[in-house]
């Protein structure tokens, strides 16, 4: 093996930045994207805190917790690009903010059907929350049987130099509804699974039965 002198190694190191140099425009976009995603993450934290406070309050007042679990996610970059492309919208940060209401998402899993309407009503009444839209897929299920209560809300997030309203999609459902939705989603990507349609239909039926108790 031929060894290189220290001078040769030093010269090769100096040349590396020139080889992997990233365009300034791309770096600026990456920084802006990172900042916007941070803002959505903070908005999720605000919304989760609101539901956690309500859950604590109701556990004392009613001696039980109506909320079993709170999940959250920020949409992945590839999912954002695919959704904007599908809608025929430009792939820009401005387009994402204007056209997508579900970049930030919070899912609230409740014990019973009545809990969904109770906690959603309490959130809607908070004076710093703006309701953008509501879709009740419990009273009006989707064709595939999907049931859930969807809210697009706008919540203020306080940063060091400003107050920024941010949109968050909130999905509220029971444990049974969440299990069925999760199974249905998995089977969409597992078409070869024997008896897939039967499994979904059975789970959907059981979800309705459980929610009626």
Residue spans for each PLM region:
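Conserved small/polar residues in nucleotide/adenosyl-binding loops
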Residues: 203-210
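Charge-rich, low-complexity segments
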Residues: 1-99
């Amino acid at each position: 093996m031929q060894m290189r002198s220290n001078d040769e190694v030093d010269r090769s190191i100096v040349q590396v930045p020139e080889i992997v140099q990233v365009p300034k425009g791309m770096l600026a976009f990456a920084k802006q994207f990172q900042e916007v995603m941070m803002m959505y993450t903070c908005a999720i934290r605000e919304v989760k805190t609101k539901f956690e406070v309500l859950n604590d309050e109701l556990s004392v007042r009613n001696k039980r917790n109506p909320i079993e679990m709170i999940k959250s996610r920020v949409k992945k970059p590839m999912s954002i690009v695919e959704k904007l492309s599908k809608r025929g919208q430009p792939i820009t940060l401005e387009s994402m903010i204007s056209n997508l209401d579900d970049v930030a998402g919070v899912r609230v899993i409740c014990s019973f059907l009545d809990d969904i309407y109770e906690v959603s009503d309490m959130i809607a009444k908070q004076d710093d929350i703006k309701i953008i839209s509501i879709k009740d897929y419990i009273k009006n299920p989707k064709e595939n049987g999907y049931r859930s209560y969807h809210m697009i809300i706008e919540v203020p997030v306080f940063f060091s130099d400003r107050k920024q309203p941010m949109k968050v999609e909130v999905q509220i459902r029971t444990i049974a509804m969440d299990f069925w939705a999760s199974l249905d989603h998995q089977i969409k990507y597992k078409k070869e699974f024997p008896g897939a349609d039967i499994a979904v239909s059975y789970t959907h039926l059981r979800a309705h039965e459980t929610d009626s108790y």
